[in-house]
Amino acid sequence: IAPGVRWLRMGLPFALDHINLWLLEDGDGWTIVDCGITNDATKAAWEQVFASALQGKPVTRVIATHMHPDHLGLAHWLTERWQCRLWISATDYNAARLASQSTTGFGGERSAAFFASHGLTDPEALAKVRARSNYYAGMVPNVPESYRRLLDGMSVNIGGRAWRCIAGYGHAPEHMALQCDELKLLISGDMVLPRISTNVSVYDLEPEADSLTLYLDSLSRYEPLARDVLVLPSH
């Protein structure tokens, strides 16, 4: 993509069948941006990357743009394998710890009742929501026990280049995109996508959330970027 920036694509077992991940050269090692979900196929894909693309250097840092399973799922495995730290916003880290250990907010009876109260009455659809009680924990069975916090406006030095964190809301609790002036790149995660609409939802955990306003307001944070910035989306 650019000097020191490699584009990886890994499969997902959904209708949205892939995720774009990023490998950034970082001095004597590599920084991974986003992880893929926890399954054997994704682990095998990463092992192929480790065998062919690292040039003998280790992974020294894992960054997750946000807590969703396709972005954070394998963070525990990657950080344990390479004995490195996870970098993520505090809000998403703690939300992931909660979601991976409970059935809150992503499916089950409470979610079905919440959606029914807003007009979802189709029995088949409600049955699917009830069946998702273990949805998040199934793809994020573990979250690293420690992390380093990403903050809005924070500059992260990766390979001698400054990458600025841009917080976004509405899609995830506290999503962090990464923008590099020198390379004219924006790793947008799920906040800016080229073809599909970003998932902007309200869950039973925060029933009065105004997620759409949060998301639309967040988009204004990208308006100052130069027109020639290359956007690297997750899907």
PLM regions and their residue ranges:
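Conserved beta-strand hairpin/beta-sheet module of binuclear metal-dependent hydrolase folds
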Residues: 2-57, 84, 178-188
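Conserved HGGG/HGGXW glycine-rich cap/lid loop of the alpha/beta-hydrolase fold
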Residues: 9-12, 71, 167
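Active-site HxH/HxHxD metal-binding segment of metal-dependent hydrolases
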Residues: 41, 51-157, 184
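Short aromatic-enriched loop/helix-cap "lid" or pocket-rim segments at secondary-structure transitions
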Residues: 18-20, 98-102, 198-200
